[in-house]
């Protein structure tokens, strides 16, 4: 069954939340000049907060050993002993991080269950399969879908890249939309002037602050302040520019 990758929405659809998944994580929605991405939450997040992805399992993300497989194969078998829940990495990514095929990335369709055992089989969601044969020398990493179980951007413990802003309160374990482009409301840290670039705050969870080129806070901009200066601790109009 095919799912649309981009939805043409109506005003207000960005505020819809559900406890059951309605779209593939990462599905895009456009409403006039605003763009959104479909995500789930790992904690309750109120409206206007910047969201980041969760950390995931570091031991699965790099240097996993594999069994040999031919070009065109649609499965990769992990040869090391691991504990992996069934389909934990569905709609996530398999990357080759080192040796020969390094730099390649594949979408994951699903994975088998293993508990302190070898032989986890990862099925890739690409009909042409692997672009080249792999040997036992290759090293891979597994990543869950970045839009799965997001959390408010943590000022003191950044786990992942920023994903977008909530448009309404989203309960823990629920599904909803994050604004990634266009105008939206955001929690403000400090008093950024009108039109200045903004970064994720390093002092207030889920907030944005002014980009400080000459200071110590030189993170990549995630948006721009709107037509008036922001007020510390309040929500202001910003132009999101994450994607």
Predicted regions and their residues:
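Extracellular receptor-binding modules and their adjoining Ser/Thr/Gly/Asp/Asn-rich linkers
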Residues: 1-86, 98-243
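Short conserved beta-strand and strand-loop elements enriched in small hydrophobics
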Residues: 91-98
């Amino acid at each position: 069954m095919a799912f649309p990758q981009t939805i043409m929405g109506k005003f207000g659809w960005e505020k819809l939340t559900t406890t059951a998944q309605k779209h593939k994580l990462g599905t895009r929605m456009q409403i006039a000049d605003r763009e959104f991405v479909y995500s789930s939450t790992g904690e309750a997040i109120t409206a206007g907060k910047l969201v980041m992805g969760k950390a995931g399992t570091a031991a699965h993300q790099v240097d996993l050993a594999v069994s040999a497989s031919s070009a065109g194969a649609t499965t990769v078998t992990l040869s090391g002993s691991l504990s992996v829940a069934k389909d934990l990495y569905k709609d996530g990514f398999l990357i080759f991080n080192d040796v020969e095929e390094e730099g390649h990335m594949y979408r994951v369709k699903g994975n088998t269950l293993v508990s302190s055992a070898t032989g986890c089989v990862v099925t890739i969601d690409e009909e042409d399969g692997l672009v080249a044969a792999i040997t036992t020398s290759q090293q891979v990493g597994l990543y869950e879908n970045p839009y799965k179980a997001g959390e408010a951007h943590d000022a003191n413990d950044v786990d992942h890249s920023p994903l977008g802003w909530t448009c309404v309160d989203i309960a823990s374990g629920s599904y909803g939309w994050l604004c990634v482009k266009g105008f939206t409301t955001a929690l403000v840290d400090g008093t950024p002037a009108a039109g200045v670039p903004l970064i994720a705050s390093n002092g207030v969870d889920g907030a944005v602050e002014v980009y400080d080129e000459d200071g110590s806070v030189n993170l990549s901009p995630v948006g721009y302040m709107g037509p008036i200066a922001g007020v510390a601790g309040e929500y202001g109009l910003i132009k999101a520019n994450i994607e």
